[in-house]
Swiss-Prot record:
Binds 1 [2Fe-2S] cluster per subunit. This is Nitrogen fixation protein NifU. It holds the Pfam family NifU_N. CDD domains: NifU_Fer2_BFD-like. InterPro entries: BFD-like_2Fe2S-bd_dom, BFD-like_2Fe2S-bd_dom_sf, FSCA_dom_sf, NIF_FeS_clus_asmbl_NifU_C, NIF_FeS_clus_asmbl_NifU_N. It comes from Leptolyngbya boryana (Plectonema boryanum). SUPFAM superfamilies: Fe-S cluster assembly (FSCA) domain-like, SufE/NifU. Keywords: 2Fe-2S, Iron, Iron-sulfur, Metal-binding, Nitrogen fixation. Gene3D superfamilies: 3.90.1010.10, BFD-like [2Fe-2S]-binding domain, Fe-S cluster assembly (FSCA). The gene is nifU. May be involved in the formation or repair of [Fe-S] clusters present in iron-sulfur proteins.
Length: 205
């Protein structure tokens, strides 16, 4: 149940109009909070209150808008308003929301282009030795994975490398987050497979 996303909820209901997608977001957050409370686990909140306030009408910050845009692949201001209500009041923040969306899209395109170039380069490289593989894994974790997790209150540490199995320790918010499995696969394993070897498997210890 902890792996249920707002998109899963919307799909289970047979699809929701965009104007009602904020209900699925609220439902997912409520489900997560209820499960954590039942298990006696303190809920790890996203660091939304520490970012710049974008929509004063509904109290929505820049980090929350960025997170929702990234997680749901949003491309328009109207979609953001449907998902988190930001921009649905006085409208003075619409330009700021558009800037956030543009920045996220630009980042994705830049990352995709860089990854494509790196994959092409990797295809002509000689096979990595164990020492080279471990060093490259550590480099990718330090430079590309950890900064993203730290920004969201978490962290990851390389524990061991056994063949193609990369063992890591999740820390901070990532250690108790309901989405820790998704973090391993999407944020850590996917990045290492692209940057180091496509056969790597990441495991938490």
């Amino acid at each position: 149940a902890l792996n249920v996303s707002n998109q899963d909820i919307a799909a289970f209901l047979g699809g929701l109009p965009e104007a009602k997608m904020h209900c699925s977001v609220m439902g997912q957050e409520a489900l997560e909070a209820a499960i954590f409370k039942y298990r006696g686990i303190e809920v790890e909140h996203h660091e939304e209150d520490e970012g710049a306030l974008i929509c004063s009408c509904f109290g929505i910050s820049e980090p929350k808008i960025r997170r929702v845009v990234i997680e749901n692949g949003l491309t328009t201001v109207e979609q953001v308003t449907s998902y988190v209500k930001a921009g649905g009041g006085c409208g003075s923040c619409l330009a700021d929301i558009e800037d956030i969306i543009t920045a996220v899209i630009d980042e994705k395109e830049t990352t995709a282009a860089r990854i494509a170039a790196e994959i092409s380069e990797a295809q002509i490289r000689k096979p990595l030795t164990n020492v080279q593989k471990i060093a490259l894994i550590q480099k990718v974790l330090d430079e590309e994975v950890r900064p993203v997790l730290i920004a969201d209150g978490g962290d990851v540490e390389l524990y061991d490398v056994d063949g193609d199995f990369v063992k890591v320790t999740l820390k901070g918010a990532c250690g108790s987050c309901a989405s820790s499995t998704a973090t391993l696969k999407d944020a850590v394993e996917a990045k290492l497979r692209l940057r180091v070897l496509p056969t790597l498997v990441v495991q938490a210890v």
